[in-house]
Amino acid sequence: MKALRNYLDKIKPNFEEGGKFHAFQSVFDGFETFLFVPSKTAKTGTHIHDAIDSKRIMSIVVISLVPALLFGMYNVGYQHFTHTGATGSFFEMFIYGFLAVLPKIIVSYVVGLGIEFIVAQWKKEEIQEGFLVSGILIPMIVPVDCPLWILAVATAFSVIFAKEVFGGTGMNIFNVALITRAFLFFAYPTKMSGDAVWVSGDTIFGMGQAVDGLTVATPLGLAATTGTVPEFSMDMVTGLIPGSIGETSVIAILIGAVILLWTGVASWKTMISVFVGGAFMAWVFNAIGMENNTMAQMPWYEHLVLGGFCFGAVFMATDPVTSARTERSEEHTSELQSPS
């Protein structure tokens, strides 16, 4: 890294004012900041000095997402091999899932960061690190069969209209990943719901077995179509069920929650308030006793482990930019988020 640092210092004058590559200063600054801690710090005014900056915050959030992402990759392979009748080892299932998910991660980052680089160049501003988190969140909240071109369109839409039009990182009032999910759901509903999107029916480099028209329902989807309340099982906790790539494993998500809380990046009040609010609303619907509504009959604890609720409580409600900042607002905002 020292050699790279020396090389960047050597070419840096070319990107400063008066240099022959001054037009690309924001690109150079973004690349340098990504690799090394910025050398400039605020010394006056109302700034609060701390050992952590935005790059470290975003890096910690990405690290906290890794357990859920890795398990999601394995689960993609597990669901494919289980429902197609193919045989494969743990390693083969993980590699299959890795190869299925990796293109979505690449598309998300290429499109999102590409737009941020273009906007930074146009506005002659530094490139921010905000999309480091959004770029990994977006592939984790979509089904494995979501087409890459649709993911690219949704990512571009959310970065432009939910972030850049408000001023970029730290200025946006909406969560970019959630806007991506909402755009996909309303613009391409058949690619985000139903029974044909949750399990891949394709082979990847000879692994797995190709099955045309493979349909597998999620526990909530099965409850909606059959009218039968799903029985609680440990698979709902471990995550060995069909669902969006990174949202199924409660255990992996809670490992990420521990990382966020231990480093102080997320507020425990926000997380607990979402879980408490969700459990309370589920209990209310149970008490009302809606006989014709299967979801209202589900036990409160099943609501907390299905449908991405846990993922939303840990990673969406605690978003550093769009979440509440004061203690009272953290509690009330989270309580309002949980019923949704």
What are the functions of these language-model segments?
Residues 271-327:
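A beta-strand-loop signature enriched in Asp, Gly, Thr, and Trp
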Residues 1-105:
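N-terminal signal-anchor module of multipass membrane proteins
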Residues 170-254:
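Long hydrophobic alpha-helical segments that form multi-pass transmembrane helix bundles
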